[in-house]
Curated annotation (Swiss-Prot):
Keywords: ATP-binding, Cell cycle, Cell division, Cell shape, Cell wall biogenesis/degradation, Cytoplasm, Ligase, Nucleotide-binding, Peptidoglycan synthesis. One of its GO terms (cellular component) is cytoplasm. This is UDP-N-acetylmuramate--L-alanine ligase. Belongs to the MurCDEF family. Its main location: cytoplasm. It catalyses: UDP-N-acetyl-alpha-D-muramate + L-alanine + ATP = UDP-N-acetyl-alpha-D-muramoyl-L-alanine + ADP + phosphate + H(+). Cell wall formation. Transmembrane segments: none annotated. Pathway: Cell wall biogenesis; peptidoglycan biosynthesis. The keyword Cell cycle applies.
Length: 464
């Protein structure tokens, strides 16, 4: 690519999937520019690395670019996309650029509706601890590295494989994980679960004959793909058909302990004891997937165990913001009913005796409409729920699909719920809703993330 491409322009460069790729490209020596509707903290690091960042989308921004990379949120009607088409500048999706980067490495792609970011981070951390110095591109900030991405000197590139727009089908990894397959982004697949399943099957069938598919066989849809694969498969989970099986899971502080048993012929042997610095059974599964990859590339068990014990998580994935006046605040990206349920369950396991309050910002009108009843049932596990209005993520509003409607449906089932439409004024109002000693979970993939920095001012103290 270097002989033909020097200037790369990225539309939506502040997005979680874009800025990691931008950072790797900058470190490779490419000239990178980009635009975002709300550049800010998400693009400061890129500016420091030499990227030119434009606020807003204008046709003039693409001048001089050899290629334009767009995120999945950018429509064809975007003025920069239209200008690039008129100037005959190639326009590609972010996954196509990721696939180009992966061509020069041994690709490890992490797919699944839920758990991609954490699993990718775990894999990158273990490979780094094992001295393999991987390149990684993650949809969240790996706390230990302080970044979403890094250019390593080793042979492996670890990245998330995004199914939201089916662009993961551009990737050609040598190893892949599928954590789960769940109903989300169904507009991409014509509303058909069969089409969604088929896309994951195509993704796995792109693996070479010498590769490895690491699959969570606790998930029936994932397990059902195995008969159609020619690539070697490593099964993981809690179930009896797993090759790597987690047993004896216990809570340890804000984390967990568990034993890993490995199938040898027709029996299991106790292989590894793990201390994991992040909570929840879902994260035990994510760790099992990472262990499977690490064992394939030859990392010793002792190194795997140490890396998992040292792992401190990813930004906005059960991120402990702090404790203020006896109130513990945890921030999480969860925005799908299943993610919400898993995060609430994790919080309950860590703080079983404390009141649990969830402040949730629904994300996308289409998702809220499609999974309306599931949102109600998943949020019912909290003691109290505070709802904001829906974060559109660029979608047009749908009649009758509002945060207020969701709150009313919850109240009709006897749930304790409060609707706060304006997120800008929400922090003080949320503070007033919290009982003494509560745990507050702020959940959502939209602008609710901005609340984390406001709590010291709201509570009038620094976190303890």
């Amino acid at each position: 690519m270097r002989n033909w491409v020097r200037q790369i322009h990225m539309v939506g460069i502040g997005g979680s999937g874009m800025r990691g790729i931008a950072e790797v490209l900058l470190n490779l020596g490419y000239a990178v520019s980009g635009s975002d509707l709300r550049p800010g903290n998400s693009t400061l690091r890129l500016t420091d690395l030499g990227a030119r960042i434009f606020s807003g989308h204008e046709a003039a921004n693409v001048r001089g670019a050899d290629v334009v990379v767009i995120s999945s949120a950018i429509p064809e009607s975007n003025p920069e996309v239209q200008a690039a088409r008129e100037l005959r500048i190639p326009v590609i999706r972010r996954a196509e650029m990721l696939a180009e980067l992966m061509r020069f490495k041994q690709g490890i792609a992490i797919a699944g509706t839920h758990g991609k970011t954490t699993t990718t981070s775990l894999v990158a951390s273990i490979l780094g601890a094992g001295g393999l110095d991987p390149t990684f591109v993650i949809g969240g900030r790996l706390k230990s590295a302080g970044t979403h991405a890094a250019l390593g000197s080793g042979e492996y590139l670890v990245a998330e494989a995004d199914e939201s727009d089916a662009s993961f089908l551009y990737l050609s990894p040598v190893m892949a994980v599928v954590t789960n397959i769940d109903a989300d982004h169904m507009e991409t697949y014509g509303g058909s679960l069969d089409n969604l399943r088929g896309a994951f099957l195509q993704f796995l069938q792109r693996l070479p004959f010498y590769g490895l598919a690491v699959l969570c066989t606790d998930e029936a849809v994932v397990a059902g793909l195995i008969p159609e694969l020619r690539t070697p498969v490593l099964r993981y989970g809690f179930g009896a058909d797993a090759d790597l099986q987690a047993r004896d899971v216990t809570v340890q502080g804000i984390g967990s302990r568990f034993a890993v048993w490995r199938r040898v012929d027709s029996d299991y042997v106790h292989w590894l004891d793990v201390e994991l610095g992040i909570p929840g059974r879902h994260n035990v599964l994510n760790a099992l997937a990472a262990i499977g990859i690490a064992s394939k590339v030859g990392i010793p068990e002792s190194t795997i165990a140490t890396a998992l014990a040292d792992f401190r998580g990813v930004g906005r994935r059960f991120e402990l913001v702090g404790t203020f006046d006896g109130i513990t605040v945890v921030d999480d990206y969860g925005h799908h009913p299943r993610e919400i349920a898993a995060t609430i369950a994790a919080a309950r396991s860590v703080w079983p005796e404390r009141p649990l309050v969830v402040a949730f910002q629904p994300h996308r009108y289409s998702r809220t409409q499609a999974l309306f009843a599931d949102f109600v049932s998943s949020l019912a596990a909290a003691d109290r729920v505070i709802l904001t209005d829906i974060y559109s993520a660029g979608e047009k509003a749908l009649p009758g699909v509002t945060g207020r409607a969701l709150a009313e449906a919850m109240a009709a089932q006897g749930m304790s719920v409060r609707f706060l439409p304006d997120l800008l004024t929400a922090p003080q109002q949320i503070r007033a809703e919290l009982p003494a000693g509560a745990v507050l979970l702020t959940l959502g993939a939209g602008s609710i993330a901005s609340l984390a920095a406001q709590w010291p001012q709201v509570f009038g103290e620094d976190p303890s």
